[in-house]
Amino acid sequence: MQNTLQQISIYGRLLGAVFYYEPNDARLTDILTFFRQPNWMQEWEISFDVKTHKKITALIEKGLQQNITEQYQYLFIGPNELPTPPWGSVYLDPECVIFGNSLLALRDFLQQHQIAFQTQQDEPEDHIGLMLMLAAYLAENRPHLLTKFLREHFLTWAYHFLEQLSKIENSDFYQALALLTIKTLQQWQVDLHINVPTVRFYR
């Protein structure tokens, strides 16, 4: 259990930061350096089949030779319509809006347990990057809340979003990041014995 919590702490912060911050943000310097190591995957304590391992490493290597700032802008900022919006309520709300009912439920959870954090521009808290970093925070400080958070507020939609992101062409680095995150979340789910409820997606 302790090893799982440690993994969630490390990988949650690392993956969350890469999804949340722009590539030129100083907070990503060391993380991108990590991914530039030829054998970085040997340090990732998650089991991968050979095909997935090769695909992720090839996409990471190729992606880091591209302009990932442009890719980040296209995927997560705009100004055009985002192909895969990074907020959970977009997929769970019948009207496909941010600040939907699933976000309100997440906010109730945060308020009930007196968890507060500041976002960059008062954006919804159910951003994929923030949710990963919140998982890391809970693993470090409130592990008794972690399973409930993952089961009811995060894993319900995370796989759906990540699978869509993994299919976006010309975004090699973020395609790889999506595949890596899927495998990592699946391992957390197994380790913590989480049964994720089936939900309906509207996008």
From Swiss-Prot:
Belongs to the TorD/DmsD family. DmsD subfamily. HAMAP family: DmsD_chaperone (MF_00940). GO terms for cellular component: cytoplasm. It comes from the Bacteria. One of its GO terms (biological process) is protein maturation. InterPro entries: DmsD-type, DmsD_chaperone, DMSO/NO3_reduct_chaperone, TorD-like_sf, TorD/DmsD_chaperones. This is Probable Tat proofreading chaperone DmsD. One of its GO terms (molecular function) is signal sequence binding. Required for biogenesis/assembly of DMSO reductase, but not for the interaction of the DmsA signal peptide with the Tat system. May be part of a chaperone cascade complex that facilitates a folding-maturation pathway for the substrate protein. It comes from Haemophilus influenzae (strain ATCC 51907 / DSM 11121 / KW20 / Rd). Keywords: Chaperone. It holds the Pfam family Nitrate_red_del.
